[in-house]
Amino acid sequence: MQVTETLKEGLKRAYTITVTAAELDAKVQEKLVEAQPDIEMKGFRKGKVPLAMLRKQFGPRLLGDAMQDAIDGAMRDHLETSGDRPAMQPEVRMVDGETWQEGTDVVVEMKYEALPEIPEIETSKVTLERLVVKADEAAVDEALKNLAESAQNFDDRRKGSKAKDGDQIVIDFKGSVDGELFEGGSAEDYPLVLGSGSFIPGFEEQLVGAKVEDEVTVKVTFPTEYGAKHLAGKEAEFACTVKAVKAPKPAEIDDELAKKYGAEDLAALKAQIAERLEAEYKGASRAVLKRALLDQLDTMVSFELPSKLVEAEAHQIAHQLWHEEHPEEHGHNHGTIEPTDEHKALAERRVRLGLLLAEIGRKAEVTVTDAEMTQAVLAQARQYPGQERAYFEFVQKNPQIQQQLRAPIFEDKVVDLILEGATVTEKEVGKDDLQKAIEALDEM
């Protein structure tokens, strides 16, 4: 077996692997000897079938396996000897594959880009500022007010009052398309908060100003992406009878409100709110700190990037942003989306930082534990109520999804590792300043 280098230019590598006919024949023989003890054939005891007969019957079938094993072994030996780590799966092509005949040498061309040598960084030279926000009394009171509004009751307005935005009306309604009632389009004594956006766009607005006993015909058009395909894009009429108009009445901020939310009393609820707010502030602060760290790391290192990785990342960015700008397009029935220079620059940054963090994690032997993966899968499974088991099975069978869940956990652990060695000072700020810092992340 011979491996000949044909290209070594920057990170690009190309090799010709030659497996001689004799080596391939020996591999086939090896597989036949390995299988012989388990083979039964008429006229022979188990394990006693002559190799010549086995070769005649199974040789052609084993030839492909032997060829693949030989090539895989040559590639594995080469990578171990050279120390190369391919950035992506190597491209492998058999020379004269369509005309190759048994008894001749197998020649394979292998191409790949090697991962670059990544310089070490001195984490002690990383200087960062962590924003710290305390949950003050005003923030807790604001959160309490929001909870009270969420727990609000509705009291009947005086007779003859017109419904306002934010009021709750109780209605009977019957929906029809082209004069025909449709399934699921009718209800009685339905409580609807005007302005809540819980009905089809345009429905609630037409009931503002209605009074008890009013008969209102609401005309709307179902959205084109509506879930019920037979109604999507159709014009509909709803015959509505208003049976009650009620004004919102916020719940009192007291121990009773606290008990509604599972707290022992108001003081305990305030403590829970403060704890939740500070956890939210801490999470937002970490996002700002992480971006600052990545920005700094990006200026500290410079190395050649595998062009194929950058190209793949740029196309993924372009594709993702295109779909964000065209949310109505759910499939892939669109033309090729060519990355812009901005996409390519962002791709280079992501690949550079990704390789740097991966190398730091590799050298520090950072791993993602089974428990951490389980937590990540559980968190995702909660987004599919009633289908959690199916989601678990889907993840188990899909290594790509497993990697998508593992990658951010690994990255965060490496970030924590770098922060441990960095100089990080704390700066106490208000929540508005933190909010501005978070908004600035989206603008970058």
From Swiss-Prot:
Keywords of the record: Cell cycle, Cell division, Chaperone, Cytoplasm, Isomerase, Rotamase
Gene3D superfamilies in the record: 3.10.50.40, Trigger factor ribosome-binding domain, Trigger factor, C-terminal domain
Domain PPIase FKBP-type: 166-251
Xref: Pfam families: FKBP_C, Trigger_C, Trigger_N
Keyword Cytoplasm: yes
GO MF, any single term: peptidyl-prolyl cis-trans isomerase activity
Domain of life according to the entry: Bacteria
Span of the signal peptide: none
EC identifiers of the protein: 5.2.1.8
CC annotations in GO: cytoplasm
Entry annotated with the keyword Cytoplasm: yes
Catalytic activity: [protein]-peptidylproline (omega=180) = [protein]-peptidylproline (omega=0)
Domain remark in the UniProt entry: Consists of 3 domains; the N-terminus binds the ribosome, the middle domain has PPIase activity, while the C-terminus has intrinsic chaperone activity on its own.
Family: Belongs to the FKBP-type PPIase family. Tig subfamily.
Function comment: Involved in protein export. Acts as a chaperone by maintaining the newly synthesized protein in an open conformation. Functions as a peptidyl-prolyl cis-trans isomerase.
Protein name: Trigger factor
